[in-house]
């Protein structure tokens, strides 16, 4: 019965999203990412309803497929409650618990998943006419999904998480800049700046997330790499700008 209910909510939300043209998220997440230490019994994510009407909230975790539904997601974590009604100006705590098979995840590096929160607003009430009949006009309704990163972090990783950005390796490779992550953690960079004619130019069109023990490269604007910096996003979602040292 629960399976059918969850599937129904997801289907209705998709229909609403397809026909909608505008919308505003009333459900606000208190965090831009979730870190799950492998030895934790559970971790919590707080959310609140900043709107003036109740919202139906559905939450689930996927392994990177943005099109996956709650019933298709195959991950070793569960969220309680998966569906909840959040009253206006009230909050809700989502409790995330690892299943026993989470121990089968790689214990030598972080794993990344995505946490989804679907905000399904109520149907607007029809207007009453003078004869007390309810006028039900056509309306557009939008279900808004928030999606944030969810990191599973093995406790066996002993590196200092606060100095991760200092371990990034930067190498000029012709007209490109090679970026190496020699750590077992995911590193998220929101901007890479190159100074040109005393103006900072962001070389990233969108953020860059480096997987553990991986590398990537971007194209430089010119050969001048003497004044470059980057913005690193830490565990708390804070953005920290640092000088690139070659």
Description of each model-found segment:
Residues 1-12:
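Bacterial N-terminal signal peptides that target proteins for export
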Residues 10-20:
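Bacterial N-terminal signal peptides
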Residues 25-48, 159-172:
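Beta-sheet-dominated interaction scaffolds and their linkers
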Residues 47-51, 177-183:
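Asparagine-centered strand-capping/turn motif at beta-strand->loop junctions
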Residues 53-61, 180, 187-192:
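Short, hydrophobic/aromatic beta-strand segments
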Residues 63-73, 191-196:
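Short, basic/aromatic beta-hairpin or loop at an interaction surface
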Residues 69-102, 198-225:
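Intrinsically disordered, low-complexity Pro/Gly/Ser/Thr-rich segments with frequent PxxP/GP/PP motifs
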Residues 101-155, 225-246:
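Terminal connector regions
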